[in-house]
C-alpha cells in the first residue's frame, strides 16, 4: 500500500453543512486519521466553466479557487473520497502516487 497525494478543488465561499467546504474537508480528513492536510487560496484561476476568477475583481469576492491537499496512505484517501461521495459533494480532484519522507531523518 503506497502513499498518495490527493488535491481537491473548491471555491473559498462554498459551504457544506454550514461550514466552508475546505474546513469541512480538513476536519473530515483529521477524523479519518489522515496525518495532515492543508488548504491554499489561489491568486487567480478558472474551472470547467471557463470564467476567470482573480483577486482584483471585486464582484468575484469569495469566488477564488481553494485547493485542499492531503498526503496519506491509499486506504485513507479511499475512505475520504468515499465520505465525500456519501455526503453528496461534487469536487474535482487529482490523485497521484507520492513518495513521502522527512528530511534529516
Residue ranges of each PLM-predicted region?
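Positively charged, small/polar-rich N-terminal and surface patches that mediate targeting and assembly
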Residues: 1-105
Amino acid at each position: 500500500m503506497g502513499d498518495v497525494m490527493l488535491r481537491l478543488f473548491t471555491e473559498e465561499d462554498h459551504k457544506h453543512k454550514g461550514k466552508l467546504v475546505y474546513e469541512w474537508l480538513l476536519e473530515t480528513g483529521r477524523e479519518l486519521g489522515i496525518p495532515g492536510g492543508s488548504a491554499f487560496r489561489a491568486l487567480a484561476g478558472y474551472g470547467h466553466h471557463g470564467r476567470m476568477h482573480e483577486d482584483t475583481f471585486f464582484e468575484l469576492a469569495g469566488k477564488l479557487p481553494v485547493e485542499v491537499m492531503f498526503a496519506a496512505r491509499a486506504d485513507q484517501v479511499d475512505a475520504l473520497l468515499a465520505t465525500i461521495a456519501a455526503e453528496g459533494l461534487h469536487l474535482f480532484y487529482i490523485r497521484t502516487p507520492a513518495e513521502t519522507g522527512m528530511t534529516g531523518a
